[in-house]
Amino acid sequence: MATLETTFAGLKLKNPIIISSSGLTDSAAKNQKLYEAGAGAIVLKSLFEEQIMMEADWLGDPNMYPEGSDYLVGYIREHKLGEYLNLIKETKKVCDIPVIASINCYQDADWIEFARKIEEAGADALEVNILALQTDIQYAYGSFEQRHIDILSHIRKTVNIPVIMKLGDNLTNPIALIDQLYANGAAAVVMFNRFYQPDIDIEKMAQSAGSVFSTDADLSKSLRWIGIASAAVSKLDYAASGGIHAPEGVVKAILAGASAVEICSALYQNSYAIIEEYVRFLNAWMERKGMENISQFKGMLNVSDLN
């Protein structure tokens, strides 16, 4: 039988199937079921900086003194952070696989201290999402990319656990950014995060939400950029996210240069049983191709081997 073990961000995974951050990973009970279903690692549901600020705005009084507003924001933040740290601790008790915490932030101020608390709570790694649409006409070129580097650099000075950067696809030069992320201590990069999709209802003549799920067509973006990045910045680990809707997608991602894949939409649309299906398919494919371990074919079809 082939060996499906892989290393991602310095973590040893029994297989390359990582459960992406979502509502599927927001409780220890759910995470235990994913672990029992065969997942290689779990990324906990993200804690969103903007959600904390929005909740504080919703509960606040516009006529409140600044001191009162600051207290409310601080109270809500501490409450949410406390809940999240408990999620880490409880999940670690029931899951004997890597548990990766996740934060979604657009500034680095208070998240640096929180990263330290995440490590103390027992998280095996931290995934950082800096997903934002830049719509300010005055926003300087390159500022968004520099924000990634600044936040990563500050977090790396605070924690010893691996820091994983999950990127959006709205970057001008992903390879240049990835090279700088590696230089500043990133252990791995996930490609790509996914924006909520907009739509328009022509009967109501109103904006509406698009599909919340990815499709298999989304995988091509990850294959392209992981194929390029894994050749250009080869010492980093990569994971493909978005579009893994069939077990063949796992093989494709590894051939492109990924060490692992993150899945979410396929679990929502099917069941936890697909984890075992993906693992079985990968094992059968490797045996059919005479592959004894994942390193034998990882990156076999990245750009360096196609030129």
Where are the regions that the model predicts?
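N-terminal amphipathic alpha-helix/helix-capping segment at the start of soluble metabolic enzymes
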Residues: 1-18, 84-92
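Extended, intrinsically disordered, low-complexity segments
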Residues: 64-70, 74, 219, 227, ...
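Alpha/beta enzyme core
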Residues: 28-66, 82-89, 93-100, 104-240, ...
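Shared catalytic-loop signature of beta/alpha-barrel
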Residues: 251, 256-292, 296
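Short strand->helix junction
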Residues: 24, 108, 267-268
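Short N-terminal binding/cap micro-motifs at the start of the first secondary-structure element
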Residues: 14, 25-30
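Short, basic, glycine/proline-bearing loop/turn elements
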Residues: 12-18, 71-74, 162-163
